[in-house]
From Swiss-Prot:
Homodimer. It holds the Pfam family tRNA-synt_His. Gene3D superfamilies: Anticodon-binding domain (3.40.50.800), Bira Bifunctional Protein, Domain 2 (3.30.930.10). This is Histidine--tRNA ligase. One of its GO terms (biological process) is histidyl-tRNA aminoacylation. Belongs to the class-II aminoacyl-tRNA synthetase family. It is an enzyme of class 6 (ligase). Its EC number is 6.1.1.21.
């Protein structure tokens, strides 16, 4: 028997209802903010992620599903949504035709990580890339969108951290200071961090092995005046709208971030990040596009669902149509189609089964009411509607079904 690939899973109701609910919350928030949806390919050229995500990141070095196709192209299944969205922005010439874009995506990503509780090799992300707006207001707007999504979804216990990584003007001096600090303990660094030290020392502070022991005493970022003003304005826009703490050690795990970075965490652990992102003013240009500022975020759907801590059944009144006689099948099918056309959730159609089997299926599907149609009912022009919770039942004329059922459908 063919089995599921390790690290992947099937998702059924009621758990799948949570995915649909969170997606709906996000779409509502994005739409109210003027966002438009982009659907990017699952496959991209591997080079795209090397240029954007960064060749020193774990994602590129170890976690991408990459392969050579029959045409000799090296492709990769997307490990994150930002590079593909930015590529789409560049390739479709938005910089010239409509430079300011709020592009959101909802889709599955793929990383060859070690499977563990709550973490899979295929996972869903919700994200937005706000391209073309250099204002600190855009940073704050993105952060508040995340807040609106998680609160409307029902996540109660979460915290928010923010920081500024500076820009190309002020970051080099800080990076050198950080390198000098970390070199004192070079021999104790993990192999990954030894490699990162010269290329991107900020990533050492994000390391799961070494990060914690260096964060507290690491030198603090010294922002230039422009970055200081930008960060202060972000905080002004957030004031009174969301609680947050400033964490100088927050660096995020990708190479392209500049200035503002942020992270939403469920509970107290940094390993429980449910969403994060930041500004990346150089990414569009580095990928071959115009010199275009941008800020964005990604939210882990599975992690956000886990943070809420409950699985909703989303129970709705459902009608199950039962036919007791083959001569009634056509009428039963007509009733089933009529109810669906009127927006009533309606199941049935097991007309080759006996009454017991059909009623058992009605119970399995958690139907609220059954409409029974047999020879006697057909002769009288009625159906019997049975409340499957109380057992109470009543006869309803064919021409009154919509009126009666419509009153109890939700």
């Amino acid at each position: 028997m063919t089995k599921l690939v390790r690290g992947f899973r099937d998702i059924f109701a009621p758990e799948s209802n949570n995915f649909a609910e969170l997606e709906a919350c996000a779409r509502r928030v994005f739409t109210l903010a003027g966002g438009t949806e982009v659907r990017i390919p699952t496959l991209e050229l591997k080079e795209l992620f090397i240029k954007s995500t960064g060749d020193t990141t774990d994602i590129v070095q170890k976690e991408m599903y990459a392969f050579e196709d029959a045409g000799g192209r090296v492709l990769a299944m997307r490990p994150e949504g930002t590079p593909g969205t930015v590529r789409a922005y560049i390739e479709n010439n938005f910089a010239q035709t409509a430079p300011v874009q709020k592009l959101f995506y909802i889709g599955n990503m793929f990383r060859a990580e070690r499977p563990q509780a709550g973490r899979y090799r295929e996972f869903e992300q919700i994200g937005m890339e706000y391209i073309g707006n250099p204002s600190p207001a855009a940073d704050a707007e993105i952060i508040l969108m995340i807040k609106d999504i998680v609160t409307s979804f029902g996540v109660k216990n979460y915290g928010v951290k923010i920081n500024s990584l500076g820009c190309q003007e002020c970051r080099p001096a800080y990076k050198q200071e950080l390198i000098n600090y970390l070199k004192k303990d070079f021999d104790t660094l993990c192999e990954k961090c030894k490699d990162r030290l010269e290329k991107n020392p900020l990533r050492v502070l994000d390391c799961k092995i070494d990060g914690a022991r260096f964060k507290e005493n690491a030198p603090k970022q010294k922002l230039c005046a422009a970055c200081e003003n930008h960060f202060n304005e972000v905080k002004t826009f957030l004031q009174g709208r969301i609680d947050y703490i400033i964490d100088p050690s927050l660096v995020r795990g990708l190479d392209y971030y500049t200035r503002t970075v942020f992270e939403f965490q469920a509970g107290d652990s940094a390993q429980n990040a449910i969403a994060g992102g930041g500004r990346y003013d150089s990414l569009v240009k580095s990928m071959g596009g115009a010199d275009m500022p941008a800020v964005g975020f990604a939210m882990g759907v599975e992690r956000t669902i886990a943070a809420r801590g409950e699985t909703k059944d989303n129970k709705q009144n459902k009608i199950f149509v039962v036919s007791l006689d083959k001569n009634c099948n056509a009428k039963a099918f007509e009733i089933m189609s009529l109810l669906r056309s009127a927006g009533v959730i309606c199941d049935g159609g097991l007309f080759d089964k006996n009454l017991k089997a059909q009623m058992k299926q009605a119970d399995r599907t958690k139907s609220s009411f059954a409409l029974l149609l047999g020879a006697d009912e057909f002769e009288k022009g009625v159906v019997t509607m049975r409340d499957l919770s109380s057992g109470e039942q009543q006869e309803i004329k064919f021409n009154d079904i919509l009126n009666k059922v419509g009153k109890i459908r939700l």
